[in-house]
A protein has these predicted regions:
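Class I (Rossmann-like) S-adenosyl-L-methionine-dependent methyltransferase catalytic domain
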Residues: 1-39, 44-96, 113-120, 124-127, ...
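Short catalytic micro-motifs in class I SAM-dependent methyltransferases
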Residues: 108-109
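A conserved beta-strand element that flanks and buttresses the S-adenosyl-L-methionine
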Residues: 105
């Protein structure tokens, strides 16, 4: 039996007392304007899944704790929410389902993934994202309750994983603890998987940024351009694009 199964009766009222609109207001505008498919990993009491459903989205709520899952189904009986027992780092059922999502939320979850399993977990999350999809994580700083299975997290680690998988940083925010614990604080991170209109760009970015053949000058050039684009505030101006096109023609 997990710590969350044992603590469910005490945790659920505390979770439900937090207003999700206030908790997630820092990234609310990044969600699809039209109804989409959203995955809530570590859905807990279903508070956030229910909020996302009221915004019109179809939500898959993944919660491995049976006690938390049962409470969530009781408190939020919404036909737009589909519950599953899937958990990181495997997410086996979701990966086998063939589903993909416009947004994936990990709210107060990443600290439960053991450090040695995070690269694998991140790769599987990215597999579930649609091109153009949004990934939102909150990172916990502060002492962990005894027996909760929490591990230290860092923004730098998440940023490195994002670069390795071709995700673009969209927003970062320092957040207070909504339960009023002075010793606990949070960092919110929003990332997006680029979309070239064909669905091929995420794969190409991953190959270009991680291929071991660093001696090929064309691959090196592409890698440099992608890393420069990762750090740019926006797309090049039309004049800059024309200059790049002219230079590309000279190199061919």
């Amino acid at each position: 039996m997990s710590w969350y199964d044992i603590q469910a009766a005490a945790l659920v009222p505390r979770y439900e007392a937090v207003q999700p609109a206030a908790l997630h207001g820092w990234w609310r505008d990044l969600l699809p304007a039209s109804p989409g498919a959203v995955l809530d990993i570590g859905a807990g009491s279903g508070r956030d899944a229910a909020w996302l459903a009221t915004l019109g989205h179809a939500v898959v709520a993944a919660e491995p704790s049976s006690a938390m899952r049962q409470q969530g189904q009781r408190l939020h009986p919404d036909h737009r929410i589909r519950w599953t027992a899937d958990a990181l780092p495997e997410l086996a059922g979701l990966l086998q389902s063939g589903l993909s999502f416009d947004a994936v939320l990990l709210s107060a979850v990443w600290q439960h993934v053991p450090p040695l399993q995070r690269a694998r977990a991140f790769r599987k999350i990215c597999t579930l994202l649609k091109p153009g999809g949004l990934l939102v994580l909150t990172l916990r700083q502060g002492p962990a309750p005894a027996g909760s299975g929490m591990h230290p997290v860092s923004l730098g680690e998440v940023e490195a994983l994002a670069r390795d998988h071709g995700l673009m940083p969209v927003r970062q925010m320092a957040l207070p603890d909504q339960q009023g614990r002075p010793e606990v604080s949070w960092t919110g991170v929003a990332l997006r998987l680029p979309d070239d209109g064909t669905g091929a760009l995420p794969l190409l970015r991953h190959v270009i940024l991680n291929d071991a053949k660093s001696t090929t000058y064309k691959l090196g050039l592409l890698r440099a351009l992608l890393r420069a684009a990762d750090g740019a505030a926006g797309w090049p101006s039309p004049r800059a694009r024309r200059r790049l096109c002219c230079r590309s023609a000279c190199w061919r």
